[in-house]
From Swiss-Prot:
Quaternary context: Probably interacts with PlsX.
Domain of life: Bacteria
Annotated SMART domains: G3P_acyltransf
Pathway(s) this gene product operates in, as recorded in its UniProt entry: Lipid metabolism; phospholipid metabolism
Function: Catalyzes the transfer of an acyl group from acyl-phosphate (acyl-PO(4)) to glycerol-3-phosphate (G3P) to form lysophosphatidic acid (LPA). This enzyme utilizes acyl-phosphate as fatty acyl donor, but not acyl-CoA or acyl-ACP.
Protein name per UniProt: Glycerol-3-phosphate acyltransferase
GO cellular component terms given for this protein: plasma membrane
UniProt keyword Cell membrane present: yes
Enzyme class: transferase
Amino acid sequence: MVWLLAILAYLLGSLSFAILLSQLSGGPDPRACGSGNPGTTNMLRIAGKRLAALTLLGDLGKGLLPVLIAQHAGLGVQQQAWIGLAAVSGHLYPLYFNFRGGKGVATAAGMLLGLYPPAVLPAVAAWLLVFAFTRTSSLAALAATPLCLPLLAWRQPEALLPMLLLYGVIVWRHRGNLHALFAGRERHF
């Protein structure tokens, strides 16, 4: 059951809402425009607020839905987290789009929302605060993501290992942004 749900979560995660919405609207391919990342921030830059909001909702949903299905199936918190991580992996390396995906922040937030909703609050607050001062989405994401870990470790310790791995993957996917930040070349809004 766990493996089947993980495979289905990966396949769901492989749906790139940024790419699909761009194709449906006749807009540019987010992998070829702006930052080249098929995610919410790049969609905001190249396609506007409406498509960016739809991308965000879709990416959140594909992280949330597999966790909720795993909960409904009676699986434990750690199994739910691994299944959520499979959805994030699909977002990062989508089967349907030549394994060229996004950075996983919104999908990870959806996963976390399913695992333990109160842990999302400090992360969202930190993201908004850092973004308000820096106008840099990547820095806000990197600052916000680890803030959910202590609360999650306290309330859902079984999910901590998959979440630590998830954080490592998100940092890895932002390595280009980190280099640009340190070089003073990172894009701002």
